[in-house]
Amino acid sequence: MTTNTVSRKVAWLRVVTLAVAAFIFNTTEFVPVGLLSDIAHSFHMQTAQVGIMLTIYAWVVALMSLPFMLMTSQVERRKLLICLFVVFIASHVLSFLSWSFTVLVISRIGVAFAHAIFWSITASLAIRMAPAGKRAQALSLIATGTALAMVLGLPLGRIVGQYFGWRMTFFAIGIGALITLLCLIKLLPLLPSEHSGSLKSLPLLFRRPALMSIYLLTVVVVTAHYTAYSYIEPFVQNIAGFSANFATALLLLLGGAGIIGSVIFGKLGNQYASALVSTAIALLLVCLALLLPAANSEIHLGMLSIFWGIAMMIIGLGMQVKVLALAPDATDVAMALFSGIFNIGIGAGALVGNQVSLHWSMSMIGYVGAVPAFAALIWSIIIFRRWPVTLEEQTQ
């Protein structure tokens, strides 16, 4: 069934359902950032030691995105979404019951398996179900779900963790996923696999230098961001010396700014994606370099978080738009690779932040993250001058 055979209202409702699913999946990926201290206290570990959980999760997603996508390339998409949500929910129940850090990590690996499949198919499904001529808006809506995960999901998850324990945060996410699953079952039509690609697509994609350059840019800039972002909660409390409540407010502010970035990209991204992304990377570089100097003032940290959140949302959207434009004939394979590469960056950044915190000083995470951010800025200028791409261009 296509959007031509259903009303625009129903088409948008389906896209909104996917956006809610995106909110759920991104909430569970981001929420440990706000719970590291509580989890560490529960298992009598150092915060930096618990942080390795972020790297494990991200690298499992990176490793399994493409294999899982290929294994499920011929599976009807509605059925696939239902199955991955079942795994997702069961894994969160195990997170709630975790009696050791090892069990918690195992449960997070289960979530990562579901995550690996979900993000390899979501963007293409959103475009497919959107009303005619509304591809960019559909992607922006999915991105809004991502932003709301930081705006509402992460801070609410942290608040629940503060008052009811971190286990209840994961349990609540599982309940939210169950409700979303019921909505998916009711709203989505049968969705045969389309343009999913196969192993035969890989050599073709690898021979596209513009696409490979975007992938390289993605891993470098995401590494820069997560070097600092992964440990922002303990940084605010232990280095800046501010309260746990302020740390929650800062995460809320950073996520809320992401919505501003989503709006900006939704209006200008089709025509000026390259310029927006390079500008956003430059803004990220400045934010990381100023993280420690800004730590002497709540106002300074708050202002920095606003620009940081705007920058990362524009970067994430810009990378996704370019990947879709450069691989219209194998969107699922290309997005599986993108999801995997993005998570390599998350894992690498979390690991770098972990090592800096353990063996140097957590106060240096911003400066260390600024190094790959500078490299990403230079690389973005080079590749965008050589391969300018907009959403409508399907360059190969």
Curated annotation (Swiss-Prot):
Disulfide bonds, paired cysteine numbers: none
UniProt xrefs under HAMAP family: MFS_SotB
UniProt topology in membrane: Multi-pass membrane protein
Matches recorded under InterPro entries: MFS (IPR011701), MFS_dom (IPR020846), MFS_Efflux_Transporters (IPR050189), MFS_trans_sf (IPR036259), Sugar_effux_transptr_put (IPR023495)
Localisation: Cell inner membrane
Protein name listed in UniProt: Probable sugar efflux transporter
Role, per record: Involved in the efflux of sugars. The physiological role may be the reduction of the intracellular concentration of toxic sugars or sugar metabolites.
Family classification: Belongs to the major facilitator superfamily. SotB (TC 2.A.1.2) family.
Species the sequence originates in: Escherichia coli O6:K15:H31 (strain 536 / UPEC)
Annotated GO CC locations: plasma membrane
UniProtKB keywords: Cell inner membrane, Cell membrane, Membrane, Sugar transport, Transmembrane, Transmembrane helix, Transport
Source taxon at top rank: Bacteria
MF terms in GO: carbohydrate transmembrane transporter activity
Transmembrane spans: 15-35, 50-70, 81-101, 103-123, 136-156, 170-190, 209-229, 246-266, 275-295, 299-319, 333-353, 364-384
